[in-house]
């Protein structure tokens, strides 16, 4: 006989959502930092040609 599943609690949903948000925030911060270093020319990990 089929039994309905228990619904996920609101606190558990919130915790999972916050974990996902933290991952996204860190990735965005890293991308922004890389973009800043490329624009100023201080990047040591990327070789990019500058157009003058």
From Swiss-Prot:
Biological process terms in GO annotation: translation
Main location (coarse class): plastid
One GO MF term: structural constituent of ribosome
InterPro entries to which the protein is assigned, alphabetical: Ribosomal_bL32 (IPR002677), Ribosomal_bL32_plant/cyanobact (IPR044958)
GO annotation, cellular component aspect: chloroplast; large ribosomal subunit
Top-level lineage group: Eukaryota
Keywords (A to Z) from UniProt: Chloroplast, Plastid, Ribonucleoprotein, Ribosomal protein
Compartments reported by the entry: Plastid, Chloroplast
Assigned protein family: Belongs to the bacterial ribosomal protein bL32 family.
PANTHER family hit by this protein: 50S RIBOSOMAL PROTEIN L32, CHLOROPLASTIC, LARGE RIBOSOMAL SUBUNIT PROTEIN BL32C
Protein name, entry field: Large ribosomal subunit protein bL32c
Organism: Eucalyptus globulus subsp. globulus (Tasmanian blue gum)
């Amino acid at each position: 006989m089929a039994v309905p599943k228990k619904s996920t609690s609101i606190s558990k949903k919130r915790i999972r959502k916050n974990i996902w948000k933290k991952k996204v925030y860190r990735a965005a911060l890293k991308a922004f930092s890389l973009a800043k270093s490329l624009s100023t020319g201080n990047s040591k990990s990327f070789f990019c040609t500058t157009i003058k």
